[in-house]
Structures are given as structure tokens and as C-alpha cells.
Amino acid sequence: MAKHLFTSESVSEGHPDKIADQISDTVLDAILAQDLKARVACETYVKTGMVLVGGEITTNAWIDIEELTRNTIRDIGYTNSEMKFDANSCAVLSIISKQSPDINKGINNIDPREQGAGDQGFMFGYATNETDVLMPAPITYAHRLVARQSLVRKNGTLPWLCPDAKSQVTFAYDEGKVVGIDTVVFSTQHVENITLPNLKEAVMEEIIKPVLPIELLSEHTKFFINPTGRFVVGGPMGDCGLTGRKIIVDTYGGMARHGGGAFSGKDPSKVDRSAAYAARYVAKNIVAAGLAEKCEIQVSYAIGIAEPTSITIETFGTEKISADHLTALVNEFFDLRPYSLITMLNLLQPIYRETATYGHFGREHFPWEKTDKAILLRDAASXIC
């Protein structure tokens, strides 16, 4: 592979789509805290002055959707009516029904190990050794930039920042290896009375420089900070937001393929979410074991059926053992039936609100980021070679 560029983007917790994701996952967490057998598919829509929460939920739990929604918006930072979206005054509407009994019948089984997949579909997991968290560099640093924006906004370092922001980072590669950062784009919402020169200087000094490795920057790196100038109108006033509309931001920034299913608001019986987490877990352990420098795994399911309909591994020519041997190891060490992967990764717990910002992958405290199978895979592979 010759020299090439690759770009990924991320968005802040105050981006309209991410507000929606966080509300959906906050509802999910509140339900799971009371009812681990709940079935949740929660969708959220946000626009100027209003939030609509809908979906299909079957549970014995009681939750206050309005209060959960307002608290989430308040935590993000929309607490001023001048933003035209305020936790204290926005309308909160909810339209919730129960899960279809036809779907429920296909999922539940007398033997929990034979729990069927909640829907048909295919999911991808990916890992690469180009960063310490075994994630692609472009999406990793795009996430870290918007996370830094939130930090300096909330701790008072840059009090004139507002919640909505976007980042985009273009990395340069040579023969598949990171060699530098070509371009950085950063746009942040701000209050009225900050000048553009002051904003650009502050963003560079307090957000960009503390995050991006200096050895990857050069005199040729291009920086575009609020390139359109003014960014006062943002959040749901500027754009409507919807759960599940940032699926590439949520995963690998376009570096790997995507099955199309979103994550937020879905309980672990939905393989769109849980199997994508499991696929990341498998791919990461393969790379951590040194069996490949890059690994993408696809897994697919039929609704109501426990066993995956396919498992496919792609290592882009970086494998140390054959694809057939890798597939055999995956089948030996990872049970990807829905109930088994939920148990393997301890997914029935209220941990999902945090996943809704700054990516679902690459943060070590999530259970699907463990590399506890790497030694087992390495030892088993050594017996093959």
C-alpha cells in the first residue's frame, strides 16, 4: 500500500444526534437498574424546545422519562433559554408501546442458552495495532478532541464554549503505518461575545495541542478552526437530532465496515448492539495476541435463532496464521450465541449512557475492551504453527 490519507470525524455530547443517543441510553440504564429481563428499544428525537421519546419497551420497571430526559439535557449543558433548548423549559413527550409478542416469542426460550437473536442482521468488529487502545488513529483522536472540548467547557477553562462541537482529523499513512497528521478541523459552538481570533487561539492552545501528539504534527499540518466563522446557533436549534444517526462516529470512523444497525437505546438482546460489542472483543483479542496487525470480523444472525449464521474474518494480509485457523480459534474460545455473549461480556448492567458519547470502542473500562483471551489465543496458535 502506498502513501494515502484517511479521515474520521467525531461530535460532542451536545451535538443534537448525541443528545438523542444519550437520552435513549439513559432510559435504557434506568430500566436495566430495576429489570434485567426488560426489552428496550428507545428512540429519541430532539428539536428546538422539545424532545420526543418513543419506542417499544416491555418491563416491570417504573421510570420517570421526563425527569430522566431533563437531567440528561442538564448534564450536557443546555441550561440557558438563550440556546432555544433548555432542560428546564423544553417540552418532553413520550410515545411508548410494548415489544411485539411475535418478536418476544422468538427471543425467549426455556433454555436461556438457546435465546434467539432479536433480529436478523450482520455486525462487524475491528481492531488495529496503530494505537495503544487497538483502534484506528483518526477516530481515536477525533473523539479525544471533542472530549477535551467538553472538559474545558465544564471546568471553566473556556467558559464561553457551548455544548455543540465537531472534530475531524486526517492522518497520513505510508505502507499502512501512521506517519503524521495532515489536517485538523474543529468547529465549536460559542457565546456571542467571543472574537474569532481569540476563539481560534484558545481552541488551539487548550483543546488541540493537549490532545494531538506533537511528533505527528508538522509545519505542513493544516488547521481549520471554526472555518465558517460564527457558530452561535447550534444544538437542537440549529439541527434536529435523532437516535442512531452517528453509527460511524460510534464505531471505527469508517476504517471498518458497518452492518447498519445503531446501538443506543437497545437492550443487549438486540444483536445490533451486543454482537457488535462481541465482535470488537474478538477482533481486539486477536490483535492483542499478535495473531494479526489488523482484524475485522463479521458475524450474522437469523431472528429467533441462537447460533450465528456466519462468522468471517479478514486480516488484510497481516495475519500470522491462516484465516481458517483463526476462524477455528474464534469458534473454540468465543461463544457468539446471544445469551452466551451477553454473559461473557456482562452486558446486563446499566453502563450504556457513557457509551453514547466519544465512541463505543477504545475505552478500556468497557467489558468488551478486555484482552483476557489474548494469552489463550496466542498459546493455542503456537501449537498450530
Curated annotation (Swiss-Prot):
GO cellular component labels: cytoplasm
Catalytic activity: L-methionine + ATP + H2O = S-adenosyl-L-methionine + phosphate + diphosphate
Superkingdom: Bacteria
Cofactor(s) needed: Mg(2+); K(+)
Gene3D superfamilies, per database record: 3.30.300.10
A UniProt-annotated Pfam family: S-AdoMet_synt_M
Keywords associated with the record: ATP-binding, Cytoplasm, Magnesium, Metal-binding, Nucleotide-binding, One-carbon metabolism, Potassium, Transferase
Residue sites binding Mg(2+) per the record: D17
PROSITE patterns (UniProt xref): ADOMET_SYNTHASE_1, ADOMET_SYNTHASE_2
Biological process annotations from GO: one-carbon metabolic process; S-adenosylmethionine biosynthetic process
Pathway membership: Amino-acid biosynthesis; S-adenosyl-L-methionine biosynthesis; S-adenosyl-L-methionine from L-methionine: step 1/1
Positions of region (Flexible loop): 99-109
Purpose of the protein: Catalyzes the formation of S-adenosylmethionine (AdoMet) from methionine and ATP. The overall synthetic reaction is composed of two sequential steps, AdoMet formation and the subsequent tripolyphosphate hydrolysis which occurs prior to release of AdoMet from the enzyme.
Family, as annotated: Belongs to the AdoMet synthase family.
Cited PANTHER family: S-ADENOSYLMETHIONINE SYNTHETASE
Protein name: S-adenosylmethionine synthase
Organism encoding this protein: Baumannia cicadellinicola subsp. Homalodisca coagulata
Gene that this polypeptide is encoded by: metK
